[in-house]
Amino acid sequence: MPPLAPLPPLPSTTTAATTRFHASQGAAPHTLVLATEVPVALVINGIAHAVLMATPADLGALALGFLLTEGIIDQASDCYDLQIEPLSAQCVGLPEGIDAVQVDLQIAARCMARLQGKRRSMSGRTGCGVCGVESFVGLDLDCPPVPAAPWLAQVDAPTVLAAMQA
């Protein structure tokens, strides 16, 4: 794997051009502002602990909240250092266009000893497949697109609007 190369901060929102359909006005172009999500790896005292999907904003608060709610630390002051590093997809072995963030946390030795004594089991495999993975290496995000159902081409916007008003 190539060395980790930092990126500038990743955007927490993106825009998407869409078309809105109004029963009385017809179709009109529209722009949506959407939250973005990226894989975020939490690395505790140099050991990969978990990967989760998150909007790349306020990741320090997210990481501290995770440590507190998982019982890894007892209070925020048990976390001595926190570094947030955006990483390119190429650097962490993800498909092109899926950049990631690594949050490196340094916690008190007593908290780390407790964590190592009770290796956590975070099951999250029923969702998108990211939660519960310990590091970027365990991610399988190179999935083929799901083909559209054949019947979908037969449903147009006026039909959908009529069904919603029924």
Task: State the predicted function of each range.
Residues 2-166:
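Intrinsically disordered, low-complexity regions enriched in acidic/Ser/Thr/Pro/Gln residues
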